[in-house]
Amino acid sequence: MTELTDLSLADARDALRQKKISAAELAMAHIEAVEKARALNAFLLETPERAQAMARASDEKIARGEAGPLEGIPLGIKDLFCTEGVRTTAASHILENFVPAYESSITANLWRDGAVMLGKLNLDEFAMGSSNETSYFGPVVSPWRREGSTAPLTPGGSSGGSAAAVAARLCLGATATDTGGSIRQPAAFTGTVGIKPTYGRCSRWGVVAFASSLDQAGPITRTVRDAAILLRSMAGYDPKDTTSVNLPVPDYEAALGRSIKGMRIGIPKEYRLDAMPAEIGKLWDQGIEWMREAGAEPVEISLPHTRHALPAYYIVAPAEASSNLARYDGVRFGLRVPGKDIAGMYEETRAAGFGKEVRRRILIGTYVLSAGYYDAYYVRAQKIRTLIKRDFEQVFEQGIDAILTPATPSAAFGLGEKGAKDPIEMYLNDIFTVTVNMAGLPGIAVPAGVSAEGLPLGLQLIGRPFDEETLIALSGVIEAAAPRVSYPSSWWG
């Protein structure tokens, strides 16, 4: 029989329902895998006792014929989702010992459907980063390595722990969040599937905020089917989140295998960058050909304001972060460092509690929101955001069903290779993904090939609002056509 940790989420679900395996043995196999993989630093907190208790409860429900959609499925939870009674840090010193008294709506949905929690996953501090190197608890190491090299690579960020854990077969799926590409970029770097749903599709209640108008939660899994299954449980209307949209949640899994014949797939000319590596361009062309072979019609389109997206994003997101992170003052919760007076306590607490990248983004955000620069920077960035959204609306009005682009401008890079001297070098990793968040659209990254160095490469599909089903159908075509990505052997333990 296949090793339990090698099962897909869908196969594990079916085996549990058919009573070929038990939830307890499935959980134990993953608990042991997590313990052996501590060199990856993917988990910030392991919860084996909780996992075993949840698995036993799942076995009892399965025996009674009361299994939920995710009954007995072991998952990792990005440590940005509040979990009642379980430490939630956002990978920051300022929240190092924070234990929430409430459960995020998304994790509550997962437990309702029978999922089992293996622990909390590492990330960039407050989800601010593209390489999982800003975590207070140290970087995540990708399970992937370049051919012939042992140099450690980034799994991407900010959801690096989620992507690494799924790729290393430590869990059957993981929750993640995406503010400017933090689901799709790590998925592309690790050969996994990551869905960033439409803004409002998944509740943000109980998820530590970075940039509230951009943040959206979604799944990272090893297959498109698994992502569809997990998204269905994560999604849904939540009255506690004022941005949550009250729409029925489709059966995303049913979209797999749906014909894409006659669909019009937009190919944005602005995404063909002069500095783009040849292998990325070649992969994109291959994806276009796969669409054509499946009966879809690739159409060149224009998204003219794409070139302004990255600078506009790095004004809007830090501005919202500056506001959101003002709550961490050492008074109500989290770290407190004494000062000579109340203002001194604020200063000392925030200086000690926030890492370098978070402080940088707070400073940028505070600057662009200040009286003398608000109109010149923040208002202008919001106007550009409106134009970016309008670009997409016009394309979809012309009958385009989805848009195909590269997911990242390169394969995974080494830890410490980028951003040390120039943070903009790191920010450029988001060049293909930020427009999706700025426009509030759904996007998915799906494995499509490997680089010359043997590392995964992904393609991105962008869809109409709340049409994740079409993205899943199209991703299934890419997944079926692309050469299978063999997950790395467990060099870590």
UniProtKB/Swiss-Prot annotation:
**E.C. no:** 6.3.5.7
User: Which leading EC class covers this enzyme?
Assistant: ligase
- Domain of life, per lineage: Bacteria
Active-site residue numbers:
K78 (charge relay system), S158 (charge relay system), S182 (acyl-ester intermediate)
Describe the reaction catalysed, as an equation.
L-glutamyl-tRNA(Gln) + L-glutamine + ATP + H2O = L-glutaminyl-tRNA(Gln) + L-glutamate + ADP + phosphate + H(+)
Give the UniProt keywords, A-Z.
Answer: ATP-binding, Ligase, Nucleotide-binding, Protein biosynthesis
- Give the GO terms filed under biological process for this record: translation
Q: Quote the function comment for this protein.
A: Allows the formation of correctly charged Gln-tRNA(Gln) through the transamidation of misacylated Glu-tRNA(Gln) in organisms which lack glutaminyl-tRNA synthetase. The reaction takes place in the presence of glutamine and ATP through an activated gamma-phospho-Glu-tRNA(Gln).
Q: Which family does it belong to?
A: Belongs to the amidase family. GatA subfamily.
Q: Which PANTHER family match?
A: GLUTAMYL-TRNA(GLN) AMIDOTRANSFERASE SUBUNIT A (PTHR11895:SF151), TRANSAMIDASE (PTHR11895)
Name of the featured protein: Glutamyl-tRNA(Gln) amidotransferase subunit A
Q: Which organism is it from?
A: Beijerinckia indica subsp. indica (strain ATCC 9039 / DSM 1715 / NCIMB 8712)
Phylogenetic classification of the source organism: Bacteria, Pseudomonadati, Pseudomonadota, Alphaproteobacteria, Hyphomicrobiales
